């Protein structure tokens, strides 16, 4: 829940705003303004990610004890928040690519992320499983590897293709950084607040359900196991038809 909260606070709303602004500037033929918006979004995202990651890394003990009621999650949380800046930059570039109509870069990046995640978890489970502080740390390591691989692929692709845009620049039309920043914030802040409210409700659900299961079973590990089965196997199977209809 804390990691997903970082998504909502740091870049989720601004990624959507970036896609919208980029599409507008592309339609107007102002390529430089779209690229400037991307740079502004990356800077803003990096600042928010570093602040959030620093806070969570330093106070991981208190966060896990007070909110998660599971001190064993401390190494998992600390590793997860260290990856957050990479995820933020990657998602900003994905938003820019979607804005210019290039959807295969985010799709390919997601495929590489999943392949890297599963492969790294498999290899770590063979060679380093006994050295893991907790079993869940293995999954977090796989998540971190997948996100970093996806980050490098996305950044390298953008650096190689940033000069080969299909959109021709407008005839001398420019937009000031101040107006772009205002447009980004005016769109991004409401979207961020909306995403934050949804994520907070989901986080409360993710925390309360295991707590209530613990009250019922009287065993912390059994309650977490049941919750993992419900959220990871039962609910995705029940909700699978909605992935087709949506």
Regions found by a protein language model. Name each.
Residues 1-23, 85, 203, 231-246:
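Small-residue-rich midsections of specific transmembrane alpha-helices
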Residues 69-92, 230:
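Alpha-helical transmembrane segments of multi-pass membrane proteins
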Residues 109-123, 131-161, 231:
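Hydrophobic alpha-helical transmembrane segments
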Residues 146, 150, 154, 158, ...:
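Transmembrane helical elements of multi-pass membrane transporters/channels
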Residues 51-71:
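Short membrane-interface helical motifs at transmembrane helix boundaries
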Residues 86-109:
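Membrane-interface junctions at transmembrane-helix termini in multi-pass inner-membrane proteins
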Residues 30-47, 55, 181, 185, ...:
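Interfacial transmembrane-helix starts/ends
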């Amino acid at each position: 829940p804390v990691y997903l909260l970082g998504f909502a606070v740091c870049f989720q709303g601004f990624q959507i705003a970036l896609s919208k602004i980029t599409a507008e500037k592309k339609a107007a033929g102002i390529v430089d303004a779209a690229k400037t918006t991307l740079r502004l979004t990356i800077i803003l995202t990096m600042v928010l990610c570093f602040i959030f990651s620093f806070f969570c890394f330093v106070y991981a003990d208190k966060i896990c004890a007070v909110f998660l009621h599971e001190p064993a999650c401390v190494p998992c949380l600390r590793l997860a928040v260290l990856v957050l800046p990479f995820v933020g930059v990657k998602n900003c570039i994905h938003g820019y690519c979607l804005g210019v109509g290039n959807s295969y870069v985010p799709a390919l990046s997601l495929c590489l992320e999943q392949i890297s995640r599963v492969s790294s978890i498999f290899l770590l489970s063979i060679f380093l499983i006994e050295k893991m502080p907790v079993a869940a740390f293995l999954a977090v390591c796989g998540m971190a590897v997948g996100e970093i691989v996806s980050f490098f692929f996305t950044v390298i692709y953008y650096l190689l293709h940033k000069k080969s845009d299909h959109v021709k620049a407008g005839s001398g039309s420019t937009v000031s950084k101040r107006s772009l920043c205002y447009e980004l914030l005016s769109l991004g802040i409401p979207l961020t607040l909306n995403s934050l409210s949804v994520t907070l409700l989901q986080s409360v659900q993710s925390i309360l359900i295991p707590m209530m299961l613990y009250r019922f079973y009287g065993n912390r590990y059994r309650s977490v196991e049941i919750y993992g089965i419900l959220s990871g196997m039962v609910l995705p199977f029940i909700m699978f038809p909605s992935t087709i209809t949506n």
